[in-house]
């Protein structure tokens, strides 16, 4: 049947049913929640049940466990995650039924068409920067829509449909999908060698993709670039768009001065383009988070948020799930009292930044790291860098690599990484074959007063939550 748009009066009623394949993913669940709020009938499937799928179900989405061709029957559009294989039965059925199929980034681009888009790109820091920007705009009364790759703790969600005209979202460079977006404002936090498997193992193609991302801005758009990052700084001089820079460099348009760490917080003076200076206490540790906050401040300044309002938003920021998330203290069976911090960091540069933040905030504590490498390809490509940064901690426990769908690569597993770290002569890493064994092994490594960092982009976060809830007893995977 051919549906006439004028018969329904709006597009939601004309094409109300949207199905998400891989609805539990961080990027997918956020878009699904926004579309639910817009009035769409949302369904979705995923192989795993998680907090995101449970939240969506409570909000009214129909969520199915596992993938089946029957799940897409009657739907008007199928949204697919980049993690989904082409032979997925739901995609195959959608093709046979000629149901429109949209990649996740394409649907985000559709949402952005109805708002003024702010897209935050960069190899590291996207989630934190996007979250801080949403907090600044909210504090400034702009009521933004946001779609974030992590849970904004103050909102209890990774997405929200706001009543204002601005939409702030992460722009994912990992698979090149950020090139589908057409924002009014684009942020680049940094450019690093990661996800090279999607760029023909050629870093020059990564650099070119970021340059093309800025080309997608309209002629009146704005590029907000972190010139403390050499790759971004090089891009700034070649970008044929309006540019505002941020960083700690003296020539940055928006910069931080007199930066000091005070426990889990950072204190600095925010200097804005008009010459205005404002003292800021940022509710996050680490110099890398100061840079993330500067990007949010630059966005706020551009949209007319007052400097004291920007400072208040940064001071009251409640954090993001799995981004230096201080879970509290727990006691081992031997009586050792340790503080547990959960973090998503999974690239050597991210590990280095988090370690620096931990040492800056708790200089008297031993730094114990439980790390789950993410992807065999990343472990191979960054092998020496991983060995170098992981050899700097006081004690280390490695679980096996979280494959994320990849087949094992010889010489790119945790045991090979442990041997490389051991050869440096600074630490004696402990290796556990399965992530479920971490909780049992850690008490043998920990001492009273330690700071335990549990890091990785796989499922190590569930172990951290298990330890806080149940102590150091066996985790059931």
From Swiss-Prot:
GO biological process: cell division; cell wall organization; peptidoglycan biosynthetic process; regulation of cell shape
GO cellular component, one term: cytoplasm
SUPFAM superfamilies, per database record: MurCD N-terminal domain, MurD-like peptide ligases, catalytic domain, MurD-like peptide ligases, peptide-binding domain
Pathway: Cell wall biogenesis; peptidoglycan biosynthesis
Keyword Cytoplasm: yes
Taxonomy, superkingdom: Bacteria
Primary location group: cytoplasm
UniProt entry tagged with the keyword Cell wall biogenesis/degradation: yes
Catalytic activity as recorded in UniProt: UDP-N-acetyl-alpha-D-muramate + L-alanine + ATP = UDP-N-acetyl-alpha-D-muramoyl-L-alanine + ADP + phosphate + H(+)
Compartments in which it is found: Cytoplasm
A molecular function GO annotation: ATP binding
InterPro entries: Mur-like_cat_sf (IPR036565), Mur_ligase_C (IPR004101), Mur_ligase_C_dom_sf (IPR036615), Mur_ligase_cen (IPR013221), Mur_ligase_N (IPR000713), MurCDEF_pg_biosynth (IPR050061), UDP-N-AcMur_Ala_ligase_MurC (IPR005758)
Keywords, ordered alphabetically: ATP-binding, Cell cycle, Cell division, Cell shape, Cell wall biogenesis/degradation, Cytoplasm, Ligase, Nucleotide-binding, Peptidoglycan synthesis
Enzyme Commission number: 6.3.2.8
Binding site residues for ATP: 122-128
Task of the protein: Cell wall formation.
Cited PANTHER family: UDP-N-ACETYLMURAMATE--L-ALANINE LIGASE, UDP-N-ACETYLMURAMATE--L-ALANINE LIGASE-RELATED
UniProt record similarity statement: Belongs to the MurCDEF family.
Protein name: UDP-N-acetylmuramate--L-alanine ligase
Gene: murC
